[in-house]
């Protein structure tokens, strides 16, 4: 379960949506919790990141428990919505991963595993879609790739369970099969 607000949510989605076609990850084992909901992907939903009541309700509705892994992303490390989801998920015994670009981020309190991406100040002050966003994307790529390698979905550096959903990927799958 990827959790975030704004740019962090969008970056989580970038990583998560590729798990099925790249690694044949079961679609029913992938969830996104986005401050402001799905509409927040295309435009800003004001005050969504501050709505901790909604965060609590979503955790309860999704029945997040010990069988879940919840990855919370927050460039500031202090996004109330994301912190609350991770706090409640941890309370429900889910495995929690807190990713913060701020070494003093509150979200780190709720992570069983804490990842600090200390990108410091942005070139354009306050614009977390730059260095912070890039670092989050790289971090998620590393995490998801490591998990898929450990699960046997990569063999000799080749994604052996890729789903060929178009012409380009069908050709790639033939090439992969010839190498395995």
Question: How would you name each of these model-derived features?
Answer:
Residues 145-179:
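Internal, active-site/partner-interface "lid" segment
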């Amino acid at each position: 379960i990827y959790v975030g607000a704004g740019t962090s949510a969008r970056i989580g989605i970038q990583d998560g949506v590729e798990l099925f076609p790249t690694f044949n990850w079961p679609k029913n084992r992938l969830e996104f919790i986005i401050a402001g909901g799905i509409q927040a992907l295309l435009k800003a939903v004001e005050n969504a990141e501050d709505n901790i009541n909604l965060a609590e309700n979503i955790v309860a509705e999704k029945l997040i428990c010990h069988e879940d892994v919840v990855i919370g992303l927050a460039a500031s490390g202090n996004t109330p919505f994301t912190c609350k989801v991770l706090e409640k998920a941890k309370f429900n015994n889910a495995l929690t991963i807190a990713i913060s670009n701020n070494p003093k981020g509150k979200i780190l309190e709720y992570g069983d595993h804490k990842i600090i991406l200390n990108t410091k100040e942005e070139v354009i002050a306050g614009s977390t879609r730059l260095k912070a966003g890039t670092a989050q994307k790289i971090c998620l790529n590393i995490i998801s790739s490591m998990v898929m390698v450990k699960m046997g979905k990569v063999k000799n550096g080749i994604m052996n369970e890729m789903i060929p959903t178009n012409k380009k990927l069908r050709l790639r799958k033939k090439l992969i099969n010839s190498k395995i």
